[in-house]
Structure formats: C-alpha cells, structure tokens
Amino acid sequence: GGRKLKKFLAFFLVLLVGVYFGVGWFAYGQAASVPCDVWYEEANNTPSNWSLGTKADWDPSDYFISSYEEVTILADDGEIELNSWWVENDLSQPTIILLHGVTSSKFSPDILLPMGMFNKSGFNVLAIDFRDHGESTCEDGFYTAGQDETDDVVAAISWLKDKGVKSSNIGLYGSSLGGLVALMTPAKSDDFGSIAVIDPPVDFKTLVREEMAYQGLPTFLWEPIYHYAGTVSYTHLTLPTIPTV
C-alpha cells in the first residue's frame, strides 16, 4: 500500500508540474509574442513620406527626410539581421539611435517624428528594427524584455563606431520597450554618451500583469509565466538588469 501511494504521489507531482509549465507556456505565448512584421497601417511609411495615422491630425511634412539609406546591421555573429534606416549629416555631430516599442517598428510615427526632428537639428540618425520586429530577422516571435534586444543596440553602436562615430557622440533615444532597452544597454556596453527615454516600463512584473489583464487573461498566471520563461526559455523577467547609476 505504501509503495503504491508513493508512486501515485510521484505521478501526481509530475503531472502537476507538467500542467503548471503547460499553463506557463500558453500564457507566455500569449503575453510575449510579437508579429515579426510591420503593422499594416504603417507599412508604407518611410522617412521621406509618412503619416501620423490616427495619432494626430496635423501635417508632419516639415519632418520628412528626403535622403536616407536602408542598411542592414548584423547582430549575434551575423545570425540576426537588423533592418535599419541611416541618415548621415555630419559625423562630427551627435548621432542618435532610435529604439521603438514592443510590436512596433521604425515605420511608426513614434520613431519617424523624432527622427525628423533630430535630422532638422543636424544630427545623424539611425533607426533600427529590433529582432522579431519590423523587417529584421524573425528569431522566434517573442520579445525578451530587453535581454536580447540590448544585443541589437550593441550591434548598432558597433556599426556606428566602424563608420568613425565617436562613442561620446552616440545617444540612445527609446520609447516604451525601446526606453527599457536603452536603460538596460549600459549593462552590456558603455560605448555611448547619453540616453533619453519616454515612458519606459521598469517594473516588468506589473507590465506583464497589465498586458495579461488587457488580453483577458487572469493575472495570477504571472507565476507560471515567470517560471516557464526562466526555466525553459532562459528569459529572466525580473533580473535587476537596469544598472544603478
């Protein structure tokens, strides 16, 4: 009787763990997946001609950029191709790397507007699509709360330095997830001079809970998401990766 009870308890424990991680896998897939594409309403945007869409109703044409270059930046030893837009004015002037939000891309007016503003100020500008976003390599269709995306920024910094841009003249500008990535980048590189962020999430647990509530999922699923991400996907959602300044 005792041996049967132990076998039953062991089986039940394995089943319980399997269900727990299965729930985590499903919820993680819902909360962290990204489309690996450009949003259809922004697909025709370019630095030389773009629309604000439903964000505003004024004419942004003063911030159009007539001359720009489409470039590919390699990350992860060439395994990741980052589709980017490069505008060179004067390499002795500041150069800004623009970082978009989650599920967004460089095609968004949230990137194109500041890109045009920086250009009008005589800055050089580089707008990248993170991996699994826009026209960059679709690695697995998930974002990693900045842990892999920071590698994309490091690759962009290296690309600029290869062009002769001084580290002290490189600035990071990020909004939403891009802001979080900018704040995390110093953990991997200090080859830049400044950071400006708009609305960055710094409490990822709260962010995931809010995203789950928005998608109609119960927020208590955060726990299996957290453990699935860390154990199976090696994405540690609450690591203190934003360095203290």
Task: Identify what each model region corresponds to.
Residues 4-53:
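N-terminal membrane-anchoring alpha-helices
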Residues 53-89:
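N-terminal cap/lid segment of alpha/beta-hydrolase-fold proteins
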Residues 143-163:
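Alpha/beta-hydrolase active-site loop
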